Amino acid sequence: MITMTHTAIDMSLSSTRQPTSEIFSKSAPSASDYRHNQQKIAQLMAQLNQIVLDKPQAVKLALSGILAGGHLLLQDIPGMGKTTLAQGLAQLLGLSFSRVQFTNDMLPADILGMSIYDQSKQQFEFRSGPIFTQLLLADEINRSSPKTQSALLEAMEERQVTQDGKTYSLPQPFFVIATQNPLQQAGVYPLPESQLDRFLLCLSLGYPSPAAERELLKGQDRRELLKELNAVLDTDAVLLAQQGVKQVHVADVVLDYLQRLVAKTRASQEYHGLSPRGVLSLQ
């Protein structure tokens, strides 16, 4: 997990909805694609900033991480707007959405799904769980046991789920936005390093400014505002944006800097250095 992401947020988005196969057959985004993309991204960020007040940098980083194809971890004390930010992103991105409220008695099957015997067919059938969505909100993920937390590992890394010896692909694109409370809070479990390493970004929203807090007190309920949001992007647009990120050229001088930066993290005796997966995320 890292706290940096690609700064190139102006990705290519289609001006009209097209089949995914047609999108990926395009050789390169045109100037009009970029202009259209800038308008859509600006519109999305403006609407999200009206919901999550006084946090423009957090909003920009969260959106950048999603468009870069990464998973997002929001860490803060309860009531800071973590869930609101995640729900706002889901609605504005126009993706299918599931929310799982993690608890200490939750089992992996509650997330992944399970095989249930169908008497009419005389066979077991797999019933998919809430993870079979494009954007999964794992709310208060560290309130569940490490065994349940580990149920997300394969899905976050390989975008698939294996149950009873069979592998099921997840919808594309697939993102996890997880929220967690500080370890000082009662009833929480630390996330394992293998899971932390699968998050591209870890963000903390912090307290609002006095002006933003006054607006919260005087304004409309955030939950009501969320209901009024309409999708700005859609599945094809998000996939095309991800393709645009992959096409961003990274110069050798930047790669040299990344390797020096990573080497510094691995030289410390106080914490583990950045993994190769983290290096690829930085790129």
PLM features: what roles do these ranges have?
Residues 34-77:
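Pre-Walker A (pre-P-loop) alpha-helix and adjacent loop at the N terminus of AAA/AAA+ ATPase modules
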Residues 60-64, 117-137, 166:
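Conserved alpha-helical scaffold flanking the Walker A/P-loop in AAA+ ATPase domains
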Residues 92-120:
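AAA+/P-loop NTPase substrate/partner-engagement loops
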Residues 101-106, 200-212, 228-232, 248-250:
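Conserved AAA+ ATPase "SRH/arginine-finger" region at the nucleotide-binding site
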Residues 125-134, 163-180, 191-204, 277:
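AAA+/SF3 P-loop NTPase mechanochemical coupling elements
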Residues 221-283:
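Basic, amphipathic alpha-helical bundle interface domains used for macromolecular binding and assembly
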